[in-house]
């Protein structure tokens, strides 16, 4: 989708050669049904990439190629970055992410790697991974791409019908509410108001809304001098979505 394509375009604008990896990684899914139903259309993906440039190298391995028939998770020290939010609710998700990204970085000796801030916790995990494993690569953070109504672009949006997509925009509205009120309301009050508001939508099942330190990702209960972000995860009509915004 256009979120992924924005990463590709940024890389092309800054580098001589761009490699795009397309791989649905089985080790980062904690739900078998989620893996089976995750949207995938390699022919459409390749066509979208051709419209940008015919000089893109596409790395689209099979699971056996990456894992050599032995899907085993590596061990990592995330320095607590995986304790909260996605790490709390999705089990070994980040171990799966770090395992496959380590393989990717080892296979493709790139100078830069482009990741979207929509998955901000993942960005921080990979920045930590690069430091821990001493990969000679720099992660470039890329801003979240949204539809006109504010919904963060995601492959999972394809599972939503028109009505559900409209309802899903309330996640971004909740994040914006936090951004508008962070200077005038306490964090507990912001979180409660957001929880109460989203409870009005029977299609939305809130998993978490957290305001956390941008660097160590620890949830905070009082405004601090350091940068922080608001993070949200919810199921909308049975489809799990995540989003975040920088507060200050």
Task: Provide a role label for each language-model segment.
Residues 219-220, 229-248:
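Short, basic/aromatic-enriched C-terminal tail that caps enzymatic domains
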């Amino acid at each position: 989708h256009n979120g992924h394509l924005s990463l590709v375009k940024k890389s092309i604008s800054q580098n001589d050669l761009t490699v795009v990896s397309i791989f649905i990684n089985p080790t980062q899914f904690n739900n078998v049904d989620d893996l089976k139903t995750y949207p995938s259309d390699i022919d459409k993906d390749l066509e979208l990439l051709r419209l940008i440039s015919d000089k893109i190298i596409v790395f689209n391995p099979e699971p056996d190629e990456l894992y050599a028939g032995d899907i085993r998770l590596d061990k990592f020290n995330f320095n607590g970055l995986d304790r909260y939010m996605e790490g709390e609710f999705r089990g070994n998700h980040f171990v799966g992410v770090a395992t496959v990204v380590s393989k990717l970085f080892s296979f493709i000796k790139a100078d830069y790697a482009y990741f979207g801030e929509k998955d901000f916790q993942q960005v921080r995990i990979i920045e930590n991974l690069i430091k821990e494993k001493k990969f000679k690569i720099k992660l470039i953070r890329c801003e979240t791409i949204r539809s006109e109504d504010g919904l963060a672009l995601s492959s999972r949006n394809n599972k939503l019908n028109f009505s559900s997509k409209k309802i899903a925009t309330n996640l971004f509205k909740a994040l914006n509410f936090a951004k508008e009120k962070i200077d005038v309301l306490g964090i507990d009050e912001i979180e409660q108001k957001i929880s109460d508001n989203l409870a009005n939508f029977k299609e939305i099942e809130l998993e978490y809304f957290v305001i956390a330190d941008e660097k160590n990702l620890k949830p905070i209960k009082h405004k601090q001098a350091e940068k922080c972000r608001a993070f949200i995860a919810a199921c909308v009509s049975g489809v799990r979505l995540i989003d975040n915004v920088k507060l200050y």
